[in-house]
From Swiss-Prot:
InterPro entries: Bifunctional_GlmU, GlmU-like, GlmU_C_LbH, Hexapep, NTP_transferase_dom, Nucleotide-diphossugar_trans, Trimer_LpxA-like_sf
Organism: Clostridium perfringens (strain 13 / Type A)
Positions contributing to acetyl-CoA binding: 384-385, 421, 438
Domain of life: Bacteria
GO biological process, any: UDP-N-acetylglucosamine biosynthetic process
This protein's name: Bifunctional protein GlmU
Keyword terms of this UniProt record: Acyltransferase, Cell shape, Cell wall biogenesis/degradation, Cytoplasm, Magnesium, Metal-binding, Multifunctional enzyme, Nucleotidyltransferase, Peptidoglycan synthesis, Repeat, Transferase
GO MF annotations, alphabetized: glucosamine-1-phosphate N-acetyltransferase activity; magnesium ion binding; UDP-N-acetylglucosamine diphosphorylase activity
Location of region: Pyrophosphorylase: 1-228
Gene Ontology cellular component terms for the protein in this record: cytoplasm; membrane
Length: 454
C-alpha cells in the first residue's frame, strides 16, 4: 500500500506573538514542524508534503534538509482549504495519506504507524486520531455507532448526551486518497467563518455510506501549540520523555527536572549527569562519564570515562579518560586526546591535543597541533592572530612549556623541548633543547632608598 503524508504548517500563529512562523519555534532544539516530519519518516512514510503559507520561504529553508515537497496556501481559509492546496501532490497517487499538524511535536512515530495500519486493516475511507480526556470542553466530540464513527460534533453544537462524551477529535487523520479527493470537491465554506473545514469531509463520507473509524491515543501526544505557555508545556513533556528514555537505558540523571537533553543525543550506560547540564545537537557521550553541574555540550563526541566540570564544549571531540574543567572552553573543531587534562580557565580553539598532555590552568591554545605527554604551565598563550589572519603552531611530543610563555605563531616547538617561564618564542625550538627568550634580570642596589629621597 502506497503511503504519503501532508503536514499543515501554513499558519502564522498570532497568539504566539512572534515574527517567526509558529511551526519554526523549537521544542528541545528542533523546529516543531521538523519533529512532525521526522515522526512521519520514522513511521516509514517517505513521501511528505508540507503546506506552507506565512513565512513560506523561511519554512522551506528550515525544512529543506529533510527532502520534502511543498504546497502553498496563500490565504488561510481553514484546514479543508489547506488540504485542497495539496491537490497537485495527491492527484495521480493511490493508497493512503496521513494528515497531521505541524504544531504538534509530541506525536510519536509508532502512533502514526498504528493509525495508518489501523486504517488499512479496517478498510476505512477515513480514520481519525482521537483521545479520551477528563474535561473535553471546547473539543469536538466523537459520536460512535459501535466501533464506527458516526460524526464529529463541535462543543457548542452538542446536545445533552453528546456533551457528556469524553472522546475528542485530535485533528489528525488518515484517508483513502481517492475518497479524500472526491470529498474535497464537495466542501463548502457556508459557515460563519467562511472557511473550509477538514472535519466536514467526515460528514460527506458518512452520507456516502463510507466507513469511518477512529484510533484512541494518549491526549498528551496530540497537544498543539498556540502560545508560548503551551510551547513551554510541550517542551517540558518532551524533556521528561527524553530523560526517561536515558534513565531506562542505564544513565543516571540526578535531577531530571533540571537537566536539558535534546532528542538526538546519545549517552552510554553508567554515565552520571548532575543538575544544570545542557546537552545539545547530535552529541554522543560514552559510558562511565561524570558530568558535574552546569556544563554545556553541543554537537560533540565525548569518550568513555570522561569527567567534565562546569565547562563549555562545542563541535569537538574529547578522548577517553580525559578531564575537562572547571570553567574550560573547548571551541569548535578541537580534538582532545585520551588521558588529557584540560583544567580551569583553559580555552582550546580549533586545536589537536595529544594523549596524556596536561593543560592545567589559565591557558589559551588556538590553531595548534600539540603532541603527546606535553605539559603547559599556567599563563601560556598561543599567539595565533597577527591582526589579519590566523597562523598555526606545532608543539612536539614530551615538551614542557613554562609559565607565562607566549608562542607567537607561526612557530614550531620540536619534540622533547623545554621552554623557560616568561619566554616569548618567535623562532623554531630544536629537538631536545631549552629555549629562553626573556630579558636578563638586572638588580639595581640602593634604588629604593634613592627613590625615596627624591
Amino acid at each position: 500500500m502506497n503511503k504519503c503524508a501532508i503536514i499543515l504548517a501554513a499558519g502564522q500563529g498570532t497568539r504566539i506573538k512572534s515574527k517567526l512562523p509558529k511551526v519554526l519555534h523549537k521544542a528541545c532544539g528542533k523546529e516543531m514542524v521538523n519533529h512532525v516530519i521526522d515522526a512521519m519518516r520514522n513511521a516509514e512514510i517517505e513521501d511528505v508534503n508540507v503546506i506552507i503559507g506565512k513565512g513560506a520561504e523561511l519554512v522551506k529553508e528550515r525544512t529543506t534538509s529533510r527532502n520534502v515537497s511543498y504546497s502553498l496556501q496563500a490565504e488561510q481559509l481553514g484546514t479543508g482549504h489547506a488540504v485542497k492546496c495539496a491537490k497537485d501532490f495527491l492527484e495521480g497517487k493511490t493508497g493512503v495519506v496521513a494528515i497531521f499538524t505541524g504544531d504538534a511535536p509530541l506525536i510519536k512515530p509508532e502512533t502514526v504507524k498504528n493509525l495508518v495500519d489501523t486504517h488499512i486493516n479496517e478498510k476505512n475511507s477515513a480514520t481519525l486520531l482521537t483521545s479520551v480526556i477528563e474535561n473535553p470542553t471546547g473539543y469536538g466530540r466523537i459520536v460512535r455507532n459501535g466501533e464506527s464513527v458516526e460524526k464529529i460534533v463541535e462543543h457548542k453544537d452538542c446536545n445533552e448526551q453528546e456533551i457528556k462524551i469524553q472522546e475528542v477529535n485530535a485533528g489528525m487523520y488518515c484517508f483513502d486518497i481517492e475518497s479524500l479527493l472526491t470529498s474535497l470537491e464537495q466542501l463548502s465554506n457556508d459557515n460563519a467563518q467562511g472557511e473550509y473545514y477538514l472535519t466536514d469531509v467526515i460528514e460527506i463520507l458518512k452520507k456516502e455510506n463510507k466507513k469511518v473509524g477512529a484510533m484512541i491515543t494518549d491526549f498528551e501526544e496530540t497537544l498543539g501549540v498556540n502560545s508560548r505557555a503551551e510551547l513551554a508545556k510541550v517542551e517540558s513533556i518532551m524533556r521528561n520523555r527524553i530523560n526517561r528514555t536515558h534513565l531506562d537505558n542505564g544513565v543516571t540523571i540526578i535531577d531530571p527536572l533540571n537537566t536539558y537533553i535534546e532528542p538526538e543525543v546519545v549517552i552510554g550506560k553508567d554515565t552520571i549527569i548532575y543538575p544544570g547540564n545542557v546537552i545539545e545537537g547530535k552529541t554522543v557521550i560514552g559510558e562511565d562519564c561524570i558530568l558535574y553541574p552546569n556544563s554545556r555540550i553541543n554537537n560533540s563526541t565525548i569518550g568513555n570515562g570522561v569527567e567534565i566540570q562546569s565547562s563549555v564544549i562545542l563541535d569537538s571531540k574529547i578522548g577517553d579518560e580525559t578531564t575537562v574543567g572547571p570553567f574550560a572552553y573547548v571551541r569548535p573543531e578541537s580534538n582532545i586526546g585520551e588521558h588529557v587534562r584540560i583544567g580551569d580557565f583553559v580555552e582550546i580553539k580549533k586545536s589537536t591535543i595529544g594523549n596524556n598532555t596536561k593543560v592545567s590552568h589559565l591557558t589559551y591554545i588556538g590553531d595548534a597541533e600539540v603532541g603527546e605527554r606535553c605539559n603547559f604551565g599556567c599563563g601560556t598563550v598561543v599567539v595565533n592572530y597577527d591582526g589579519k589572519k590566523k597562523h598555526k603552531t606545532i608543539i612536539g611530543d614530551d615538551s614542557f612549556i613554562g609559565c607565562n610563555t607566549n608562542l607567537v605563531s607561526p612557530v614550531e616547538v620540536k619534540d622533547n623541548t623545554y621552554i623557560a617561564a616568561g619566554s616569548t618564542i618567535t623562532k623554531e625550538v630544536p629537538e631536545g633543547s631549552l629555549a629562553i627568550a626573556r630579558a636578563k634580570q638586572q638588580n639595581i642596589e640602593g634604588w629604593v632608598e634613592r627613590k625615596k629621597l627624591k
